[in-house]
């Protein structure tokens, strides 16, 4: 009986992996993609404020600012605001040092903003407080519909052509007669440490399936998704939905903001931006564990069935097939089923390499990545539900 059950589970894993490969090609392989604009035209924008909310980002901030300051001239006045949320490491000093290096050079106006303590009696999560304070700075005179507010994370890296490309897109990127009010880009995910290689390729595939771009871009579909590391708002739309203040207590604020944009009748445009922006989310297992246990349960709407279901899908699809290989010594068909499933895992990674340039590194450790995600999910449910250990960079989210 046990052999039969394993055969059935293995066949389900094969079917699920094959379906995943097909859906990835249909939803991401053919998704709208934004790249450098070789022939930029006139802009509708009159001003751009680029905001980097930071808290203890000494390992990221210099490279982030270097990339921003290396941007091609966007063709309009712009400013760079680093909104420091009370960093206790070297972040502030590094920002000041970087800003002083080329003060006489061209580029944006630069400002390091100390956002001060969060209001007593109010719940502010994550980067919502520094983001809201940077957005509330004085704006130049002019129509707010022509002014833009770009939020990027400190672990994001802009390519030199990124700002020009996105401003050109919002100038001409119209669908169904609606102007773009929020442009968000899915970045190219980069991995460094082993923990990232185990988890991030699997998570990227799940996100691609769970948040289809086509539905997010459909004005009449309620589906709304935004990639928090890169969100470009039309100022008038941002203020109309209440900005980050309206989602102050949300841990996954990007989804809340995207939902508010669509619910208010504004236009959301979600594109693949892998040729323009790169993101490395975590530096080690500890930060990866903290990050995904913070977000996973919220990402499935605090639904325990979806959460446990996602864990079972990952463990069944990526870990079980490797267990079937040695069991092939007992039953040859078990080993064959395991080989087919592992071949499909490799096919998914090959697809990711062809479409997005993701290296095949450590693909054979997918079983370990599946087990790690299988542990992340119940930990995320526990942390989010009880508040115990639910932190980001050491700050409690409860």
Predicted segment positions?
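Cell-envelope/extracellular polymer assembly enzymes that use nucleotide-activated donors
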Residues: 47-49, 79
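Catalytic donor/gating beta->alpha subdomain of glycosyltransferases that bind UDP-sugars
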Residues: 170-209, 236-239, 244-307, 395-398
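Short, acidic, metal-binding catalytic loop of nucleotide-sugar glycosyltransferases
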Residues: 66-77
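A conserved acidic beta->alpha catalytic loop
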Residues: 84-94, 117-119
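Membrane-embedded multi-pass helical conduit in multi-pass membrane proteins
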Residues: 42, 306-387
């Amino acid at each position: 009986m046990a052999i039969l059950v394993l055969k059935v589970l293995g066949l389900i894993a094969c079917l699920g992996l094959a379906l995943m490969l097909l859906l990835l090609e249909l939803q991401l392989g053919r998704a709208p993609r934004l790249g450098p604009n070789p022939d930029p035209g006139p802009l509708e924008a009159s001003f751009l404020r680029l905001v980097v909310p930071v808290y203890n980002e000494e390992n990221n901030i210099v490279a982030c600012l270097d990339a921003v300051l290396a941007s091609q001239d966007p063709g309009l006045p712009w400013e760079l605001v680093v909104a420091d949320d009370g960093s206790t490491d070297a972040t502030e000093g590094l920002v000041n040092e970087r800003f002083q290096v080329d003060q006489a050079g061209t580029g944006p106006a630069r400002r390091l903003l100390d956002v001060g303590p969060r209001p007593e009696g109010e719940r502010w999560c994550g980067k919502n407080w520094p983001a809201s304070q940077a957005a509330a700075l004085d704006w130049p005179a002019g129509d707010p519909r022509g002014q833009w507010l770009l939020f990027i994370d400190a672990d994001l890296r802009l390519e030199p052509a990124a700002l020009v490309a996105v401003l050109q897109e919002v100038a001409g990127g119209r669908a169904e007669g609606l102007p773009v009010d929020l442009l968000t880009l899915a970045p190219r995910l980069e991995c460094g440490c082993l923990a990232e290689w185990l988890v991030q390729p699997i998570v990227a595939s799940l996100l691609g399936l769970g948040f289809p771009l086509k539905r997010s871009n459909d004005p009449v579909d309620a589906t709304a998704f935004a990639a928090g590391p890169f969100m470009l708002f039309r100022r008038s739309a941002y203020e109309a939905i209440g900005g980050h203040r309206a989602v102050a207590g949300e841990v996954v604020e990007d989804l809340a903001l995207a939902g508010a944009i669509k619910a208010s009748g504004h236009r959301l445009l979600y594109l693949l931006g892998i040729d323009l922006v790169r993101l490395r989310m975590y530096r080690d297992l500890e930060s990866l564990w903290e990050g995904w246990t913070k977000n996973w349960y919220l990402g499935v709407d605090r639904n325990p069935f979806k959460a446990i279901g996602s864990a079972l899908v990952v463990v069944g699809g990526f870990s079980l097939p490797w267990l079937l290989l040695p069991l092939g010594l007992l039953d040859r068909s078990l080993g064959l089923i395991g080989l087919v499933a592992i071949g499909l895992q490799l096919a998914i990674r090959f697809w990711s390499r062809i479409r997005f340039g993701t290296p095949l590194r450590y693909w054979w450790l997918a079983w370990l990545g599946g087990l790690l995600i299988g542990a992340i999910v119940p930990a995320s449910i526990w942390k989010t539900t009880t508040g115990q250990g639910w932190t980001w960079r050491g700050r409690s989210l409860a």
